Amino acid sequence: MQADPQENQVRTTVDIARIIDMIPHRYPFLMVDKLIDMVRGESAIGIKNVTINEPFFQGHFPNRPVMPGVLIVEAMAQTAAVLVVETLGVRAEGKIVYFMIVENARFRKPVIPGDQLRLHVAKERHRGNVWKFRGVAKVDEVVVAEATFAAMIMDEEPQP
């Protein structure tokens, strides 16, 4: 059954409780706090509030804390995963979104405690169970990182 194209155009938000229901990530690896804008099947904007309490700041770097760039890309990927799950609806039950490829990652400016990351992701392509996205992370409307990446949705393996 095809989704109604107009239904996808409805803009919506997603709070942390729903994010936790949608993706398997948990502390200390949950990198998106909420989605403030989403068009199902197309794009989303996620928020990550960066605080000094993040465990990675203990070692990166103790005297000058900087959020690791790979975790910014992970935050974009988690935002995209929520978009995929929300887009698929009940078809995503029993499935998990796996991050599989990152390309053209660029890190433009350090992200430090107190920053609020705005994680803009847009679907470039979707074929079968593979989704390709372009992501841009901003702080105060300044681009701090960007990348293209792909994810695959697969059956979740039962836990022993």
From Swiss-Prot:
The active site is at residue 60. CDD domains: FabZ. Its main location: cytoplasm. The lineage of its organism: Bacteria, Pseudomonadati, Pseudomonadota, Alphaproteobacteria, Rhodospirillales. PANTHER family: 3-HYDROXYACYL-[ACYL-CARRIER-PROTEIN] DEHYDRATASE (PTHR30272:SF1). One of its GO terms (cellular component) is membrane. Pfam families: FabA (PF07977). Involved in unsaturated fatty acids biosynthesis. Catalyzes the dehydration of short chain beta-hydroxyacyl-ACPs and long chain saturated and unsaturated beta-hydroxyacyl-ACPs. It catalyses: a (3R)-hydroxyacyl-[ACP] = a (2E)-enoyl-[ACP] + H2O. This is 3-hydroxyacyl-[acyl-carrier-protein] dehydratase FabZ. Its EC number is 4.2.1.59. It is an enzyme of class 4 (lyase).
